[in-house]
Amino acid sequence: PPNVYKNLIKSKEKYNFFFKQKINRMDYSMGLFVYYFGSKKQYKNVAHHTIYFGKSYKEHLDKIFEKKILSDDISYYLHRPSATDSSMAPDGQDAFYVLVPVPNNLSNINWSTEGEKFKDLVLNKMDESVLPGIKNNVINDFYLTPNYFEKDLSTLHGSGFSIQPKFSQSAYFRFHNKSEVIKNLYFVGAGTHPGAGMPGVLSSAKVLDKFFNELLFNKKTC
């Protein structure tokens, strides 16, 4: 919804004062650095899902949301699909992606120059912790930065999860599934009710499925 209301709808005469204040004062979620890679080495002891916390976790969050700079002591989520589906990688090899919270594009970080350096940092951190030896075993890798989220996925400021889920932007205060100001405009996704993440996004689709079922067929659903 934020990108639609701010950039895609050209005529904004239906926006009242309070709605304009709402869309202009929103706080946005972190950005994401997502690194996909294969490995010539298999890591059988690594689970499907792993969360690794850096030593200065609170400082990392402060750099993301307040200072809007990159941290050299990162926390990350590591996904190993081949742990439960062996077809995700050739025999004796492995497949991963690692997701690292970073500042969104309000930071003005130049990812064209910082991307490779940050990838090397991520590799070093994994090599020192969960995936020893990974630096010498990476194959077929690529990464996504907040620029991808902003340019390809049209998320405002390259945020990974749309608006922040703080109290003043949650529940009724979140963008509604049925637009408050534009007739026949409806939303599903991370920025609308009930919230971000796969469960929230799918739930937003279920909300509209129920709504349209009642609207089109004039019947109540359970």
Where are these regions (language model features)?
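Conserved FAD/dinucleotide-binding core of flavoprotein oxidoreductases
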Residues: P2-N7, G38-K40, P90-K125
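Flavin-binding catalytic cores
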Residues: Q42, I69-S71, W111-K151
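A glycine-rich dinucleotide-binding beta-alpha-beta segment and adjacent secondary-structure elements
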Residues: D73-Y77, P132-P194
